[in-house]
Amino acid sequence: MATPHINAEMGDFADVVLMPGDPLRAKYIAETFLQDVRQVNNVRGMLGFTGTYKGRKISVMGHGMGIPSCSIYAKELITDFGVKVIIRVGSCGAVLPDVELRDVVIGMGACTDSKVNRLRFKDQDFAAIADFELVQNAVSAAKAKDIKVRVGNIFSADLFYSPDPEMFDVMEKYGILGVEMEAAGIYGVAAEYGARALTICTVSDHIKKGTQTTSEERQTTFNEMIEIALESVLLLED
């Protein structure tokens, strides 16, 4: 049954959904990598598609920017459409000197300055971590395709334009691999509702070095990250 934000029916979505922030990236993924594709959502322009990858039913849908937006879609997909696995495929900024543009980062854990997980976890610190099998499968898929990946902590920020640039020095000190805006929220929603989640990001800009990719590149050329996510789904145990 349709929700306020997703005009689909039960069965329209696969049990695994890849979620980029940009709905146009979702469209690109569906048209480039999936077969037998059909559109299953268009509410508020947040495009969703279902198709098959090497015979495996998979869906892809945008989640927008920030924890509030992605949490709405993740919650509804899990509770109203039976989704069991969410893999965020997005972009991130880097702060470490040895992390470069287009490097692929797997978010094993997600630090955050957001308070949403404290709200759902009785004002205590919740360890927002990815599902172990999903991490393991992503690493295995990357090795099989000879794609270098970095695995570790990322940071989910509430503000894109940070008023405290010194925080980036703290992130560098603590070895944060990437800075984005959603993973901690998705991990919290997955834990609350009994699903599994993973975040895979491609470095789109380096905060310290001042280098960046274009919006068109972010939309259509981060293919290694997508290939890792799709191949990792094929390794899931039933």
From Swiss-Prot:
Site-annotated residues for Important for catalytic activity: R218
Binding-site positions, phosphate: G21, R25, R44, R88, V89, G90, S91
Entry annotation: catalytic residues: D205
PROSITE patterns to which the protein is assigned, alphabetical: PNP_UDP_1
Entry-linked PANTHER family: PURINE NUCLEOSIDE PHOSPHORYLASE DEOD-TYPE (PTHR43691:SF2), URIDINE PHOSPHORYLASE (PTHR43691)
NCBIfam families documented for this protein: deoD, PRK05819.1, PRK13374.1
Subunit structure: Homohexamer; trimer of homodimers.
Function description: Catalyzes the reversible phosphorolytic breakdown of the N-glycosidic bond in the beta-(deoxy)ribonucleoside molecules, with the formation of the corresponding free purine bases and pentose-1-phosphate.
Protein name: Purine nucleoside phosphorylase DeoD-type
Gene designation: deoD
